[in-house]
Amino acid sequence: MHKTHSTMSGKSMKVIGVLALQGAFLEHTNHLKRCLAENDYGIKIEIKTVKTPEDLAQCDALIIPGGESTSMSLIAQRTGLYPCLYEFVHNPEKVVWGTCAGLIFLSAQLENESALVKTLGVLKVDVRRNAFGRQAQSFTQKCDFSNFIPGCDNFPATFIRAPVIERILDPIAVKSLYELPVNGKDVVVAATQNHNILVTSFHPELADSDTRFHDWFIRQFVSN
């Protein structure tokens, strides 16, 4: 389904990029490297930090990390990377995963919109930022993701000024993967998939030594 790069020896390989403009890119990189050290995915996979259009051009998949969506958007525009990111995420042959701020950056519509956040507009969802409150209301919750990741229950999902998906604008294309209540009442979507695009409102990269989510991402989206 996805294009591969070829090494000099002729073996196929894929490159997972981690956008390194701002935010938790090191944590994502460390989780990915641990997955590659502990598992065989059947193909050669390389991890690359992405700061320039040249970096991005080498990637088959891209992770947009959690952080600060306004800063991420402004840096991408100021450095000239935004048009390349836009083209990448709208390419159906590329894989994209956005966590927290990455979810905001990928979304088509913001409920509490900021003029400073120029989103990439690829995921047809309506997102509300800081749905659980500010930094002081951040929390970690044990979640059961076994309905889409076999054996992935009791996963420590960390929500930091987390966005949520209030409305799926294209329910035919966008599939809800995980829902949870906000303030004990309204149920909102915290993870969705649209073919080659995955988003989570929480931070799997902050789950210490638990790499199950990243392992599933590699198997489901990159190595298949």
Swiss-Prot record:
Catalysed reactions listed for this entry: aldehydo-D-ribose 5-phosphate + D-glyceraldehyde 3-phosphate + L-glutamine = pyridoxal 5'-phosphate + L-glutamate + phosphate + 3 H2O + H(+); L-glutamine + H2O = L-glutamate + NH4(+)
Pfam families for the chain: SNO
Family, per entry: Belongs to the glutaminase PdxT/SNO family.
One Gene Ontology biological process: 'de novo' pyridoxal 5'-phosphate biosynthetic process
UniProt KW keywords: Glutamine amidotransferase, Hydrolase, Lyase, Pyridoxal phosphate
Naturally occurring in which organism (per UniProt): Saccharomyces cerevisiae (strain ATCC 204508 / S288c) (Baker's yeast)
Active site: 100 (nucleophile), 203 (charge relay system), 205 (charge relay system)
Function: Catalyzes the hydrolysis of glutamine to glutamate and ammonia as part of the biosynthesis of pyridoxal 5'-phosphate. The resulting ammonia molecule is channeled to the active site of a SNZ isoform.
Cysteine pairs bridged by disulfides in the record: none
Molecular function, one GO term: pyridoxal 5'-phosphate synthase (glutamine hydrolysing) activity
Gene: SNO1
UniProt-listed NCBIfam families: PLP_synth_Pdx2
UniProt EC number: 4.3.3.6, 3.5.1.2
GO CC annotations, alphabetized: cytoplasm; cytosol; glutaminase complex
Binding-site residues for L-glutamine, renumbered to this chain: 67-69, 129, 160-161
Pathway: Cofactor biosynthesis; pyridoxal 5'-phosphate biosynthesis
UniProt name for this protein: Pyridoxal 5'-phosphate synthase subunit SNO1
Keyword Chloroplast (UniProt): no
